[in-house]
Swiss-Prot record:
Stated name of the protein: Donuts protein 1
GO cellular component terms, A-Z: cytoplasm; prospore membrane; prospore membrane leading edge
Gene name per UniProt: DON1
Subunit structure, as described in the record: May interact directly with ADY3. Probable component of a spindle pole body (SPB) complex composed of ADY3, SSP1, DON1, MPC54, SPO21/MPC70, NUD1 and CNM67.
Keyword annotations from UniProtKB, A to Z: Cell cycle, Cell division, Meiosis, Membrane, Sporulation
Main localization of the protein described in the UniProt heading: membrane
Provenance organism: Saccharomyces cerevisiae (strain ATCC 204508 / S288c)
CUE domain boundaries: 82-125
InterPro entries in the cross-refs: CUE, Cue5/Don1_CUE, UBA-like_sf
Localization per Swiss-Prot or TrEMBL: Prospore membrane
Extent of Basic and acidic residues compositional bias: 224-244, 315-331
Function of the molecule: Involved in the pathway that organizes the prospore membrane (PSM) during sporulation.
């Protein structure tokens, strides 16, 4: 009985150990052992396929190696930078900076102008950072589309007008206000402008109107200045003529006063026209002689004044000058001689025959 029990225990221990080995073998599903036997073909086909991670790792490594070979070298970057037009522009803008530094900055900025320019600007003057820097973010098309086209045209027109009138020294604020009103009226009639051709035409027309108004204002100012000058000249001329007339009037008054003082009224005779009056004919030569006597008396009075003597004419001379011509037997005699005009004969015998018939004819006619 005892031997049988021992044999049964040994058999049980062998069975348990065999089961343990099978469990260990079954836990490693990824490994295939040659000692493993499959009972059926279906179980072999249903078993999972094994993967080889080492093989996959080697395949990944080959891909990374190919990518590393595709990267450019420093020489490739330098050669690509040297072909850029930006390099020439930066050399012109910063002649004091070394070429290698400019190329290095272009490589760092990946060939973009704005960051390269700003970095070189800081390098050239690090203490003075007052220069204008280029914007790093370019303006997109969407941002530009938000701006109204009419506003851009107005700004361009105003800039052109300010440039034109600043050279002429004219204040363009009034003109700009007029243009703004005109643009508003045009916008009401035309509406929002979309095509660039119509925008250009409107801009040119408004600009021409503004320039024409500016020239008209200049011409009106010049005309007003010229009219003022001409008016001043005419006023001066009128004043001069009034002064001349007043001086002539004063001289005439002096002559009349002088003649009244001397109790003589000057008689003017038109010698070119024939006279029917007998006394005009008789006084044809007396007026000239009286003028000569007046001149002589004036000169004598002036000499007496200079000598300090009396300037008054004696009464005897005045009486002789004021006396009427007297009749004489020798014919008609004037105050200055006999028959001065040559109308009467000098013989006294023929006086009644020649003078009286003429008087009768004059009385009857």
């Amino acid at each position: 009985m005892g031997k049988k029990n021992r044999k049964g225990k040994e058999n049980n221990a062998a069975k348990t150990s065999f089961l343990k080995v099978e469990n260990i073998k079954n836990t490693n599903s990824g490994l295939e052992l040659p000692s493993q036997d499959y009972t059926n073909v279906e179980e072999k086909e249903s078993s999972p396929k094994t993967d080889f991670p080492l093989i996959t790792k080697e395949h990944v490594n080959t891909k990374t190696d190919s990518n590393i070979l595709d990267y450019p070298t420093i020489g490739d970057l330098v050669s690509s930078v040297e072909k850029l037009c930006v390099l020439k522009e930066l050399k012109i803008a910063f002649p004091e900076v070394d070429d290698t530094l400019i190329k290095a900055i272009l490589i760092a900025s990946q060939g973009v102008l704005e960051p390269a320019f700003n970095s070189l600007l800081y390098y050239s003057s690090p203490e003075e950072n007052t220069d204008f820097a280029l914007p790093m973010k370019p303006i997109s098309v969407e941002d530009y589309s938000k701006i109204n086209v009419s506003e851009i045209l107005q700004r361009e027109i105003f800039d052109d007008i300010e440039d034109e009138f600043s050279g002429q020294g004219i204040n363009g604020s009034m003109v700009i206000s007029k243009i703004e009103s005109e643009l508003s009226s045009l916008a009401e009639h035309i509406g929002n402008i979309s095509t660039p051709g119509s925008n250009r035409e409107v801009a040119e027309s408004t600009r021409n109107v503004a320039v024409a108004e500016g020239h008209n204002t200049i011409l009106s100012n010049e005309d007003s200045i010229l009219k003022g000058k001409e008016k001043g000249k005419e006023e001066e001329k009128e004043k001069g003529e009034e002064k001349g007339v007043n001086s002539l009037k004063g001289a005439a008054v002096k002559v009349v006063a002088k003649s009244l003082k001397n109790n003589r009224i000057p008689v003017t005779v038109k010698r070119n026209e024939p006279s029917n009056n007998l006394f005009d004919v008789l006084n044809c030569d007396e007026s000239e002689e009286e003028e000569e006597q007046d001149v002589e008396t004036n000169t004598s009075n002036q000499e007496r004044k200079n000598q300090g003597g009396n300037t008054e004419v004696p009464e005897a001379q005045r009486d002789s000058a004021d006396r009427l011509p007297a009749k004489d037997d020798g014919g008609y005699k004037s105050a200055f001689g006999t028959d001065s005009c040559g109308l009467f004969a000098a013989d006294a015998k023929d006086e009644k025959k020649q003078v009286h018939p003429s008087r009768q004819e004059l009385s009857f006619t």
